[in-house]
A protein has these predicted regions:
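A short beta-strand structural signal in non-transmembrane regions
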Residues: 229-234
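Well-formed, non-transmembrane alpha-helical positions, independent of function
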Residues: 27, 83-84, 133, 150, ...
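Alpha-helix termini
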Residues: 155-162, 182, 204-208
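Acidic, polar ligand-binding/catalytic clefts
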Residues: 59, 63-64, 68-133, 209-226
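N-terminal hydrophobic or amphipathic helices and topogenic motifs
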Residues: 1-80, 86, 98, 123-127, ...
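Short glycine-centered helix-capping/turn motifs at secondary-structure transition points
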Residues: 32, 88, 155-158, 185
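Bilobed "Venus flytrap"/periplasmic-binding protein-like clamshell domains
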Residues: 35, 40-63, 115-174, 195-196
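Short helices/loops that flank or line small-molecule/ion binding pockets
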Residues: 71-91, 170-199, 203-204
């Protein structure tokens, strides 16, 4: 009798676990909408107004799947994947670095790099990170980003005007501040993400004839990657 009771109890527990797992699976999948997690203020990638190119990609996916796109917005800072995709708040991240082991990556759809950006009107002739003219220039860089290792390598940190790495993009956009300082002459050259730099320069009326972008190359000199591939993450 005791063995029958134990067997029955075990069966009930297994059935209960199966129901719960199926309920969890149902909650994790929304067949009525394409749930997208994105940064609320990270142009040119995404924002709450749907103005970024990642928003456009999400719209295209929704159109192809014939379902509406709904967003869960969260700043793309430390904990981004943990607080979005891992908590089943969305089905997909439109833009994430290839090789991120917290997600399953799609085939990359974009390659971008960090680089050096300056205005041509200022007579700057820099074409590489060890150019001697850099020793006399004011350099803008976001603290903790890969270009800081390049600047350390060439003993240029004494010329740096640093910008915070950790911030709330809903209150301040560091990339925009860096470009504004470049235009206002507070810095002579900035080391930053190419897509962000070009977006804010052109937003402020500076076309390709007015600025120079020099990509930083990934090398074997111990300063990490300077170029990245972007994928979607699921």
């Amino acid at each position: 009798m005791q063995r029958v009771f134990i067997l029955t109890l075990s069966l009930v527990m297994l059935l209960t676990m199966d129901v719960k797992s199926r309920e969890s699976a149902i909650e994790a999948v929304d067949t009525e909408n394409l749930r997208v997690c994105a940064d609320p203020s990270n142009l040119p990638f995404s924002n709450e107004k749907g103005e970024g190119f990642e928003n456009a990609i999400a719209d295209l996916l929704g159109e192809k799947l014939n379902i509406p796109v709904v967003y869960e917005y969260f700043p793309q800072v430390i904990g981004y994947v943990r607080n979005t995709l891992n908590k089943k708040k969305c089905d997909i991240l439109i833009g994430i670095t290839a090789g991120n082991d917290l997600v399953l990556n799609t085939i990359p759809y974009m390659r971008w790099s960090y680089g050096m950006i300056f205005l041509k009107e200022n007579g700057i002739e820099v074409d590489r990170p060890n150019h001697p003219q850099l020793a006399d220039l004011s350099i803008g860089v976001q603290a903790g980003t890969p270009p800081t290792f390049v600047l350390q390598r060439y003993n240029l940190m004494g010329r740096v005007r640093p910008y915070n790495l950790t911030f709330d993009p809903r209150k301040a956009v560091i990339g925009e501040s860096m470009i504004e300082d470049l235009i206002d002459g507070l810095v002579d050259i900035v080391f930053m993400s190419g897509p962000i730099a070009v977006y804010y320069l052109e937003k402020k009326g500076y076309d390709k004839s007015k600025y120079q972008f020099i990509p930083l190359e990934t090398t074997d000199q111990g300063w990490g990657r300077m170029d990245y591939y972007t994928t979607m993450g699921v």
